[in-house]
């Protein structure tokens, strides 16, 4: 099962958190969900060159807060915060709240971020670089930065082949079944002249141990 399911969804509530943090009644839930989808698509398209890996959306009574995780925060913020202000004005069209707050979070290690790695491979495929070379170089860079394991997969008409297939490469360990394993997952699509090629990346960053349970046991022993 661990090989098929989205690693983030499998670990939500265990070691991962939701990308959308809000509550709604049955009347507003569907409209909020559609708004979230539109916001994510718009921000990803507008900031496509800024390396946006993740967008968290929080909602309160009269405000919407966005936490944008990006590898190039300076490009998003702009001179004197002009980029942020322009983005706020655009986002007001998508939400019916009075305030839109934007918080920029820097992705410090972009070479080991699964989403950015997948997008990087997809961009190379669109430039007609060999998929084997693109995947192997991306894996090597991630392993050099301290990742414990990396797995990449490309699916589609690779190198213009008549029959679509899936090619995978991996290095290190990727324990997808272990819930305490910190697995980062990313997906991107490359639009080539032969059709779309799907790119998936899994990055293993070590285990996250349940610290709360350990603390309780220590207190009981004392």
UniProtKB/Swiss-Prot annotation:
Residues 39-108 form the KH type-2 domain. Keywords: Ribonucleoprotein, Ribosomal protein, RNA-binding, rRNA-binding. Pfam families: KH_2 (PF07650), Ribosomal_S3_C (PF00189). It comes from the Bacteria. GO terms for biological process: translation. GO terms for molecular function: mRNA binding; rRNA binding; structural constituent of ribosome. PANTHER family: 30S/40S RIBOSOMAL PROTEIN S3, SMALL RIBOSOMAL SUBUNIT PROTEIN US3C. Part of the 30S ribosomal subunit. Forms a tight complex with proteins S10 and S14. Belongs to the universal ribosomal protein uS3 family. This is Small ribosomal subunit protein uS3.
């Amino acid at each position: 099962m661990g090989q098929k399911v989205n690693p983030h969804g499998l670990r939500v509530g265990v070691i991962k958190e939701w990308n959308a943090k809000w509550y709604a009644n049955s009347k507003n839930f569907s409209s909020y969900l559609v708004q979230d989808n539109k916001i994510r698509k718009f921000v990803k398209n507008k900031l496509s060159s800024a390396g946006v890996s993740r967008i968290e959306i929080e909602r309160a009574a009269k405000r919407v807060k966005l936490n944008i995780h990006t590898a190039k925060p300076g490009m998003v913020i702009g001179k004197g915060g002009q980029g942020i202000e322009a983005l706020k004005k655009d986002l007001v069209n998508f939400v019916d709240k009075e305030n839109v707050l934007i918080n920029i979070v820097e992705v410090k290690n972009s070479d080991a971020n699964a989403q950015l790695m997948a997008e990087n491979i997809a961009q190379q495929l669109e430039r007609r670089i060999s998929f084997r070379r693109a995947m192997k170089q991306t894996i090597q860079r991630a392993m050099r930065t301290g990742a414990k394991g990396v797995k990449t997969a490309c699916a589609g008409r690779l190198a213009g082949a008549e029959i679509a297939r899936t090619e995978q490469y991996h290095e290190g360990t990727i324990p997808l079944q272990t819930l305490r394993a910190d697995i980062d997952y990313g997906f991107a699509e490359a639009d080539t002249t032969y059709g779309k090629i799907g790119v998936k990346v899994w990055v293993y960053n070590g285990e996250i141990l349940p610290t709360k349970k350990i603390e309780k046991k220590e207190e009981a022993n004392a």
